[in-house]
């Protein structure tokens, strides 16, 4: 988990130096687990978008941004609120192959959610923006069964929160990123990628100035294709150009040493992960 977060932290600098190593080392594994434990606790009832647990999670993330020194982006708020129509579904997870089967039981439901925005201004290239996203909503609960969503995607949100803190430590010591960074945990993902779609249609910062979106999902997942946890699936890094793909390869080969797995970076993959990743772009 730590190595995966390190590569995500370094890419926005588009370089790797002793300062970058120093600030990546400020990421604390215990803090990561603390964030995951809180976000996936029963008290948040699975963080279904529009429900009280999702609102509690949003405020928890916003308070973290405030505590590490990220200012509210406008009108003294960290939230981009949205209201959309969506279908609601229950997913059953097959433990053998992690296939999700959806049963639709209500449509035309009004969903009210929030994206949480933490903006860190850059230096000489501050008009260019890199967005780091992770969805903080999950499936909620069904009767007495709570879908806690520790890995999907409290783990990714915890990573994004720690990346934000590392950037702020670097910035306060005069080593902030050249490009501006938007750390944006989104909601509505389990309802149909609603939060990320809403931001794309209603961007706070011009899309033409956004040069990359790095999305984090399930950074604690282990599977049968790898004999250890030192790997990451990369999807969509070569969609618009090879620049991000080549940067991933270069930084990883020199400094990180992860197994970069591209098996799902395929338009023909039946899981359609490649297609879903493009919606975030």
What are these regions (language model features)?
Residues 279-281:
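Conserved small/polar residues in nucleotide/adenosyl-binding loops
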Residues 186-277:
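Metal-dependent peptidase/peptidase-like ectodomains
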Residues 132-191:
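Alpha-helical metal-binding/catalytic segments enriched in His/Glu/Asp
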Residues 47-119:
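A non-catalytic alpha/beta surface segment that caps or lines the substrate-entry region
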Residues 39, 65, 108-139:
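Acidic/His- and Gly-rich active-site-bordering loop/insert found
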Residues 21, 26-52, 68-78, 218:
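N-terminal capping segment at the start of a domain
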Residues 1-23:
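Bacterial Sec-dependent N-terminal signal peptides
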Residues 20-25, 43-52, 103-106, 144-153, ...:
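Second-shell loop/turn segments in exported
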């Amino acid at each position: 988990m730590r190595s995966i977060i390190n590569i995500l932290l370094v890419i926005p600098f588009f370089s790797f130096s002793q300062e970058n190593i120093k600030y990546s080392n400020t990421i604390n594994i215990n803090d990561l687990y603390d964030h995951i434990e809180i976000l996936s606790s029963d008290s948040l009832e699975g963080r279904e978008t529009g429900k009280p647990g999702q609102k509690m999670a949003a405020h928890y993330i916003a308070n973290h941004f405030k505590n590490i020194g990220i200012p509210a982006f406008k009108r003294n708020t960290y939230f981009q609120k949205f209201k959309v129509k969506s279908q609601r579904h229950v997913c059953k997870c097959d433990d053998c192959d992690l296939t999700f089967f959806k049963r639709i039981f209500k449509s035309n439901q009004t969903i009210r959610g929030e994206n949480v925005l933490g903006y860190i201004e850059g230096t000489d290239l501050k008009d260019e923006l890199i967005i780091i996203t992770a969805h903080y909503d999950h499936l909620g609960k069904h009767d007495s069964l709570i879908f806690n969503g520790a890995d999907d995607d409290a783990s990714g949100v915890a990573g994004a929160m720690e990346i934000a803190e590392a950037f702020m430590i670097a910035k306060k010591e005069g080593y902030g990123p050249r490009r501006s960074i938007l750390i944006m945990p989104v909601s509505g993902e389990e309802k149909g990628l609603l939060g990320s779609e809403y931001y794309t249609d209603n961007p706070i910062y011009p899309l033409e100035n956004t040069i990359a979106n790095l999305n984090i999902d399930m950074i604690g997942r282990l599977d049968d294709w790898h004999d250890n946890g030192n790997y990451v699936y990369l999807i969509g890094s070569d969609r618009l150009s090879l620049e991000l793909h080549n940067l991933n390869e270069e930084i990883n080969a020199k400094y990180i040493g992860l197994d970069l797995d591209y098996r799902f970076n395929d338009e023909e993959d039946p899981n359609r992960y490649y297609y879903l990743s493009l919606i975030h772009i």
